[in-house]
C-alpha cells in the first residue's frame, strides 16, 4: 500500500512539474521571403509563471558556432543586437504575452540560414526552452553568362556553359536547340549546372542554343550561336598569320637598312665637313691686283731679256 501511494505521489509531482514547465515552439519549419523585403520568424512560449523576469534571445546557427541576432530583456525592454542586425530586427509587441517572434527587415542573401528562438525566465532556470526555424531568402536568377569552350571546327568536341551569378534557391538550368531553319530539335539534357557537351560537331550541329536559368521567383536566359567551320579555314588562318609575320620582317629589314645607310651618309658628310674648304677662300681684291701687276711686270722683264739677248749676239761670218 505504501509503495503504491508513493508511486501515485511521484506521478502527480511529475504532472505538476510538466504543467509548470516553460515550452517554446515555432509554428513553421521553413519560411521563404524575397530579398529586400521583411519576414517574421514565428516563436511562441508557454509558462504558468506570472513573473516575466528574463529575456528572449534569437541566434543564427552557423557550422561551428552561433551568431547573435538579438536579445530582448523583459524588465528593461532593451535590445542587444548582433553585428549585422542592428536597426533591422524588432521583437513582437506581444512579447510578454507568450509571443517571442521577431521581424527582420531589408533581407539579404546573408540572412539565409537556420535561426533558434530561446526564452529564459528566472523562475524556470532549469528549463532549456528552444525551437528552430529555417529562413530561405528568395532571389531571382541573374541573367546567365553563356560561353563556348573549344574550337568550333568540324570534328571537334565543344562544351556550352551557362551560369547565373545570383539566385536563391539555386537556379536550375535547361537547354534547347534550334537549327538554321528555326526548328527545335531533340537534345540530351546534362545534369543541371553542368556544361552541355557536343561531340564531333558538324554542319548538322549548327544553329543556336538557348540556356534557361530558373528558380521559384524568376527566370532568365541566354543563347549561343554554333557555326562549325571546315579545318581548311584553320590552314588559311595560319597561312595568313605566317604571311603577315613575313611582311612585317621585310618591313623591319627595310627600316634597318635605311637607318644604316643614313648613318653611313652622316659619317661621310662629317668627314667632308672636317676638310678645309679651299674653294670658299678668296684673295682680297687689292691683293689680287698687286699679284696681277707683279705677274705682268715679270712677263715684260722676261720679254726684254729675250729681246736684248737676241740683238747683242754678233753675226757669225759665213764660212
Curated annotation (Swiss-Prot):
Location of the Ig-like V-type domain: 22-134
Segments on the Extracellular side according to the record's topology features: 22-235
Keywords: Disulfide bond, Glycoprotein, Immunoglobulin domain, Lipoprotein, Membrane, Palmitate, Signal, Transmembrane, Transmembrane helix
SMART domains xref list: IG, IGc2, IGv
Keyword Disulfide bond: yes
Keyword Glycoprotein listed: yes
Main localization, broad class: membrane
Annotated localization: Membrane
S-S bridge residues: 43-117, 146-222, 162-211
Residue ranges, Cytoplasmic side: 257-319
Topology in membrane: Single-pass type I membrane protein
Biased composition (Basic and acidic residues): 267-276, 284-308
Glycosylation sites: 99, 112, 200, 223
Transmembrane intervals: 236-256
Modification after translation: Palmitoylated.
Domain Ig-like C2-type: 140-227
Pfam families linked: ig, V-set
Signal peptide: 1-21
Coiled-coil regions, chain positions: none
GO CC annotation terms, alphabetical: plasma membrane
Function summary: May play a role in cell-cell recognition and signaling.
Protein's recorded name: Cell surface A33 antigen
Protein encoded by which gene: Gpa33
